[in-house]
């Protein structure tokens, strides 16, 4: 059985959501509705549905993570399907596709989404009628769409990005609706965080990936997302951006390690390479191979190189990484004083030091930069409490190699 989970503080569109469930070919489902707020009246047509279960207890909960957790904890199904109270499932085969994916061993199932703008307009007879229009995201961020027709209405579905550390690191590029968890994967990942007011699904997707669960795409668009002025994603945009940024900073390295294991990519650690006798003065220009590594780590090593060697290291690392592979660099930050902490250090770094490798204008001025990276993070880190207490900070740059692959986020080079 699939348990469809729907919190609601405004049941205005529940009948449409209900219709999208009734029109499914797969009928082994229950609909768990969790009212959250005062004076919530569930439509009679929904209450008459024998597969509906209304769960009390959410009316005094304030965080969406707690409300969704209550819904999942109250569900009877083998898997949980999230359906927002103002959205719809694509009719016919959506639940069947989801069930098939879980039968094949998936722990998390997701689909493409068609977003539509919805508003009431006045027609030529002065009557208020609904208006539906397609909505798409900026192609500058890597988004692609394709046409679909649902209920006779032309819409545009947005193609999900491949599951990578980069796409999972921010809610904007993570799998959109529909999002579904097997019961096993949900609880092994820890379930929804009841402390989160937004981004609860984003954190749970990260935890699910890190738990080792299999992610599986339904193969097409199976969700219709209604966009209007009162969407939570618009009203709480600043809070969402702040939380998703904190998740990106906290979890990117763990996501990279999980991704390496899932795809069999190797990691090259420059400190370990130096321990084998590798000498950048003699061997740097030989490079590290081509499309060979998923992650290259240079932890407090680049400050020991000359400036031209840093440039050649960046070119060589780029060549050695697979498309979309990751480069992590930690260096002392010059303005805190730590950049001159050793008389033998030859290069000095600030937050702008990766600009020649991530921004076209800076690369063009250098003339010998052949690599193309997207900077994901520039973090202030401290190797020890002593460094922190004295304000001696380091910078950790986390970047992805741009080699022509479809890639989430703006590319400046």
PLM regions and their residue ranges:
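N-proximal low-complexity "stem/linker" segments adjacent to membrane-targeting elements
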Residues: 1-20
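Short, acidic, metal-binding catalytic loop of nucleotide-sugar glycosyltransferases
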Residues: 19-28
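Glycine-rich, basic loop-to-helix element that forms the pyrophosphate-binding segment
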Residues: 58-75
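Short aromatic/hydrophobic "clamp" motif used to bind/position activated sugar donors
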Residues: 80
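Conserved donor NDP-sugar-binding/catalytic core segment of glycosyltransferases
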Residues: 95-148
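Catalytic beta-strand/loop signature of glycosyltransferases that borders the donor
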Residues: 112, 215-222
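A recurrent flexible, glycine/aromatic-enriched loop bordering the glycosyltransferase active site
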Residues: 139-181
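Acidic donor-binding loop at a coil-to-helix junction in glycosyltransferase catalytic cores
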Residues: 198-204
